[in-house]
């Protein structure tokens, strides 16, 4: 019943938003205009046309509903072989799929074609914290799990909650349910909790903490990227501290599952062209994103691993739907 309802609503949404002649390519933003998924479609779509990767402007269709589930259902059930369709996605997409939030649908029902920018994940402490490094924090948790509480801007089981747990997994820690986490309303509130001494650390995204970092309120003890973030070169990655974790709010696309490998690779190549363009570099600078380029099979492998890890942790936390 739930899937049938989603399908009916998705079909209605498509007709509501598709009253114009179709173009060669369409990008579905699974949200209302103005959000992150809408930004992904409009920026990538515009640049694809501007650099000549697409012969015609990319049509953007907004299809909000069910946290991205409405659009996902539409693609899987109605357009599984549409090679002219791309769909905006982010780390929220993979988290919801891993937690079975899309009415029983799974991540292997589409193909993840690429990500070309991200808001880096961070772990931060108050400026006067006793923890000088990520290793100090991890050692404290290993010695006494209840001694450290994290604050984050997502609910229990959300991506902010999962970031430090990924690090602890790499340290061999398995009792993740014993780690204290307080979900608050956004990164600023999480920082307030930490600076005020109510929690010992906060977990969030780089864009949320920049002003607090510049004011000297906090110290970032790890950025969860493969390499240090340009402009914040003094902040070490978790990887270089011995915990190979990449946890970023990536901006990317998926495509229908049943398109051919050649069609999949063509979209991957076009995304790489966008990633390499000065237009995209400017778009990232204007919107607080850091470079994060994975396309084609490399990105699909990254997503597969991410979904598997999140599914395991979510089951242990009891948040799988």
Question: Residues of each region from the PLM?
Answer:
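N-terminal (or domain-start) structured segment
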Residues: 23-108, 173-201, 293-294, 316-321
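An extracytoplasmic/periplasmic, membrane-proximal ligand-sensing/linker region
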Residues: 261-321
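A ligand-binding cleft/hinge motif common to bilobed small-molecule-binding domains
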Residues: 91-101, 165-172, 200-233, 311
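Periplasmic-binding protein-like
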Residues: 115-122, 222-257
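C-terminal segment of classical bacterial N-terminal signal peptides
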Residues: 14-22
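Hinge/capping helix and adjacent helix->loop/strand transition within the periplasmic-binding protein
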Residues: 50-52, 74-85, 97-189, 251-283
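Bacterial N-terminal signal peptides that target proteins for export
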Residues: 1-9
